From Swiss-Prot:
Cofactor: how bound: Binds 1 [4Fe-4S] cluster per subunit.
Stated name of the protein: 3-isopropylmalate dehydratase large subunit
Binding site for [4Fe-4S] cluster: 348, 409, 412
GO molecular function terms attached to this record: 3-isopropylmalate dehydratase activity; 4 iron, 4 sulfur cluster binding; metal ion binding
GO biological process: L-leucine biosynthetic process
Cystine residue pairs: none
Keyword Cell division in annotation: no
Chain's gene name: leuC
Organism name: Bifidobacterium longum subsp. infantis (strain ATCC 15697 / DSM 20088 / JCM 1222 / NCTC 11817 / S12)
């Protein structure tokens, strides 16, 4: 019997096979780090008198707590400032490469690494961050870990893990012109639920997936965790190789040829058997938006807010009632009737150059609606920012009435100055719409950059077709 992509990468990194139910010992190629989940790990290393086993395989950046304006001024939030200075001190003490705020390569941890060519097919990649699954778009086995595991990887460059189950999600057919990668993953999560992928590595397959750019593939893999999965992967192909070629950390010359030869072997065998298979017809998809307080509460933009009294399952009915109350909605109201206060375009889900181009193409020649308080456009990395400015996208955003910011996690989460106030409603290209995710009492609707841009123009949740 053949093996899946995930099983092949696992086998290539197996240091020791566990016996009698014990976990395997897996070698880790690359660990990415940021200011939030690393302090205790560094302290543990310090107290044990250890040094990193392979410091050249550890790379850090500042992203979660960083301001996206006035980055040359002192951080007014003392806790955030402490976390940032602590990371800088720890990296200096232990010799870990750091891309700090203001550095040309600084950015969200899951955005700067692919751009630099650090993320490559067949690698094992970890980070103390759940959205590490983003890197699976390259055919890497990438997943988030806890702080104690961060320390373990620094000390040993390995992790003890039991093999994950495997799931295939086949997205066959052609994606309609008004549908995007974000709509694919929101539709998947709406179908299988936020726990549907629990314990699995999801491999995204099919014509619609193969036709995506690398930026779009990263969007899909990024939200694997919102489906409950440990990781998401897409088999590398010519699109992957073209993206990587010539990047700072990509192999060169003969090493490039050798790497590509290996990368081409990283695909699921025809006779491999997945533990679970889900099929999606891409031709039926369109713009999706979340209405509730978890990423699985999503619907086509043409739908209406669910009516709880029509939901048979008592648990789901109660969840819908709570979400509708928190979000300040009415059962049965059309999604397109929902007025929005703030628009956020950015995050490790949708802050890449393809995303910014998508939004700019829709915003060009328009101005934000009067009821929209603010539109924040935040590139996922400093390199994305520079590329966008080279293309004149920043001018498009500013003419539209949007704020063009520096790179960072920004309004994806309430850990930096970019927050919503209680009851403020946003449409956001980020990945989570939990209660209070964007600030205490915040109300978040997840959507693609194109839907976010159209919403900013009309003031109510809209698709480009509504313009």
């Amino acid at each position: 019997m053949g093996t899946t992509l995930a099983e092949k990468v696992w086998a290539d990194h197996l240091v020791r096979k566990g016996s009698d139910g014990a976990p395997d010992l897996l070698y880790i190629d690359l660990m990415l780090m940021h200011e939030v989940t690393s302090p205790q790990a560094f302290e543990g290393l310090r107290l044990a008198g250890r040094k990193p086993r392979h410091v050249d395989q550890l790379i850090a950046t500042e992203d979660h707590n960083t301001p996206t304006v006035d980055i040359d001024r002192p951080n007014p939030d003392k806790t955030s400032a402490l976390q940032l200075t602590t990371l800088e001190k720890n990296c200096k003490e232990f010799g870990v490469r750091l891309h700090p705020l203001g550095d040309a390569d600084q950015g969200i941890v899951h955005a700067f690494a692919p751009i630099l060519g650090l993320t490559q097919p067949g690698m094992t990649i970890v980070c103390g961050d759940s959205h590490t699954s983003t890197h699976g778009a390259f055919g890497a086995l990438a997943f988030g870990i806890g702080t104690s595991e961060v320390e373990h990887v620094m000390a040993t460059q390995t992790l003890s893990l039991k093999p994950f189950k495997t799931m295939a999600i086949n997205v066959e057919g052609k994606l309609p012109a008004d549908a995007t990668a974000k709509d694919i993953i929101l539709a998947i999560i709406a179908k299988i639920g936020t726990g549907g992928g629990q314990g699995y590595v999801i491999e995204y397959r099919g014509e619609a997936i193969r036709n995506l750019t690398m930026d779009e593939r990263m969007t899909v893999c990024n939200m694997s965790i919102e489906a409950g999965a440990r990781a998401g992967m897409i088999a590398p192909d010519e699109t992957t190789f073209e993206y990587l070629k010539g990047r700072p950390h990509a192999p060169e010359g003969e090493l490039w040829d050798q790497a590509v030869a290996y990368w081409k072997t990283l695909k699921t065998d025809d006779d491999a058997v997945f533990d679970k298979v889900v099929d999606i017809d891409a031709s039926t998809l369109g713009p999706y938006v979340t209405w509730g307080t978890n990423p699985g509460q999503g619907l086509p933009i043409t739908a209406s807010v669910p009516e709880p009294d029509k939901i048979a399952d008592a648990t789901k009915r109660a969840a819908a009632e709570r979400a509708i109350t928190y979000m300040g909605l009415k059962p049965g109201m059309p999604i397109k009737d929902i007025a929005v206060d703030t628009v956020f375009i950015g995050s490790c889900t949708n802050g890449r150059i393809d995303d910014l181009r998508q939004a700019a193409a829709i915003m060009k020649g328009h101005h934000k609606a009067e009821n929209i308080h603010r539109v924040l456009v935040v590139p996922a990395s400093s390199r994305v920012r520079l590329q966008a400015e080279k293309e004149g996208l920043d001018k498009v955003f500013e003419d539209f009435g949007a704020e063009w910011r520096n790179a960072g996690c920004s309004m994806c989460l309430g850990m930096n100055p970019d927050k919503l106030v209680p009851n403020e409603r946003s449409i956001s290209t980020s990945n989570r719409n939990f209660e209070g995710r964007q600030g205490k009492g915040s109300r978040t609707h997840l959507a693609s950059p194109s839907v976010a841009a159209a919403t900013a123009i009309r003031g109510t949740i809209s698709s480009p077709a509504d313009l």
